[in-house]
Amino acid sequence: MQTADQAGQLAAGFSTYQKWVVGLLTFLQFTIILDFMVLSPLGAMLMPQLGITPAQFGLLVSVYAFSAGASGLLAAGFVDRFDRKRLLLVFYGGFVVGTLMCGLVRTYEFLLFARMITGLFAGVLGSTVFAITTDLFPYQLRGRVMGILQTAFAASSVVGLPLALALSNRWGWNAPFLLIVAVATLVGVAAMRYLRPIDAHLQLRLDRSPLHHFLHTVSMRRYLQGFATSALLATGGFILMPYSSAFLVNNLGIEFGRLPLVYLVTGACSIVAGPLIGRVSDAVGKFLVFCFGSVVTITMVLIYTHLGVTPLGLVILVNSLLFVGVSSRMISASALVSAIPDAADRGSYMSISSSVQQVSGGLAAILGGLIVSETHTGALQHFDVVGYVLVGTTLVTLVMMYFISRRVEGRGASPRSA
């Protein structure tokens, strides 16, 4: 049931400060997502230049995910004991340093180490962003906020990836990481100067040791349900996306120089669709939107992973529809899952959830690397099998999200939890 304050806020929409916070967090998410996503299109360049196999490339993706997962678990016991602004700034600074290392290294081994360092800090950042979002916005507005935050993913495709690919074509694969460092530095300075302290949760924190707080969080049954769902949600992106650029170039016949156009149009569709999906999820129900996204995702994955040499226009259409389906799932799922934890456990829950996603994604990337193999021409084999795995996890998460939706709606997303 809504309180009078909540009803008033829903009628008024976002305050000026809330709009600014959403904008800042979106830019921050943009740098984190771009740092992770940029490896996928660079795969077609990195593998031959560094002389590595798809399995080794999968390890580059996985080491980031595993280190992010480890840091999130280690941080889970104490993240609720600090002002979220300070926590954000400390880990964002470490993320910038790690990304700078990626821009300076020249060998596979050092790049592997740099990705591990970057992941250590990025692992806590994602959960902190969502904890801040949950602290500052009521559940009834959260779909809208998640829809806007999701545009960071799309903006990475529209602006970040084409620009990163252009820089890599001109100055080498290190250049995109230096671009991310430049943008992230500006975002960090803005957050330091203008973001207000976010410490209301400190008034709710129970007097537990970090270990006790961690054990309490991982022992709650409804939290475990959320963790399991988050793990499967992450599997799809990690098992398919890291190998998409190589699949586009070597299987579908798309020239490497045309990849920026594919990501540009696909991302533009996601930018338009993201906020609309968020509004619709708040209006008609988040689980209904999740169902729609799951159906679209399954359909497009089955089409995409079975394509042969394909005209550029059709590739862009299939990719765009696939991203709309994925966005629908992630926006609605993020809003639903954010309502699971109590306010006093929010940072810890989000940190563990993020860690579970990262570890699950890392395992999925390794699995994808083991399933996919290259022919002597560079074409990928068994990519359809990867698609079948993704379809299977999508169906399972659909069932799991149904029960989460019933639990969240049954609790009414009370202020204590939402």
Regions found by a protein language model. Give the residues of each.
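Cytoplasmic helix-loop-helix junction between adjacent transmembrane helices
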Residues: 114-154
